[in-house]
């Protein structure tokens, strides 16, 4: 799983003073989705995670300055925080996955996730990857020949397979 925070925006509200919303990009199993969270949600997550796993430091809560440079530093800090939680923990708590709106993640530890493969095989070579698919609208082998001339190569191969004892023409 990869997590990035590519951007943030300032929201103004009639009921309360403005706040910053961070856009989180989550890449998992070849799929990408976005989640938007306020700093207060990050802080609440951090408090809960501290009780069950090793957590890195979270950027300071008290930033009264809405200067874009300060908010950019907070964005980078929160991105580093999320990435560190992923790197430092073999199993991610459901609480963390729910925060990122991740619905399914194998619960096996990384070391046991490929139990049927040879243990000497590297983790990189055992990962599945998505490959493009070539799609034919019609079966190219069933279509009529483009010309009236016989296909000499195909006839020769078929003749060799089915009539090996006969001499070619």
UniProtKB/Swiss-Prot annotation:
Q: List the subcellular locations.
A: Cytoplasmic vesicle membrane
- Taxonomically, the superkingdom here is Eukaryota
Q: How does it sit in the membrane?
A: Peripheral membrane protein
UniProt KW keywords: Acetylation, Cytoplasmic vesicle, Lipid-binding, Membrane, Phosphoprotein, Protein transport, Transport
Task: Give the GO cellular component terms, alphabetically.
Answer: cytoplasmic vesicle membrane
GO MF assignments? phosphatidylinositol phosphate binding; phosphatidylinositol-3-phosphate binding; phosphatidylinositol-4-phosphate binding; phosphatidylinositol-5-phosphate binding
Mainly localized where?
A: membrane
Which Gene3D superfamilies is this protein grouped with? Phox-like domain
Tell me if Translocase is a UniProt keyword of this record. Answer: no
Where does the record place the PX domain? 1-125
Per UniProt, a 1,2-diacyl-sn-glycero-3-phospho-(1D-myo-inositol-3-phosphate) binds at 38, 40, 61, 74
Q: Pfam families, per this entry? A: PX
Q: Which cysteines are joined by disulfide bonds?
A: none
The record's listing under SMART domains reads:
PX
| Domain notes from UniProt | The PX domain mediates specific binding to membranes enriched in phosphatidylinositol 3-phosphate (PtdIns(P3)).
The record's function comment reads: May be involved in several stages of intracellular trafficking.
Question: What is the protein named?
Answer: Sorting nexin-24
Q: Which organism is it from?
A: Homo sapiens (Human)
Cite the source lineage.
Answer: Eukaryota, Metazoa, Chordata, Craniata, Vertebrata
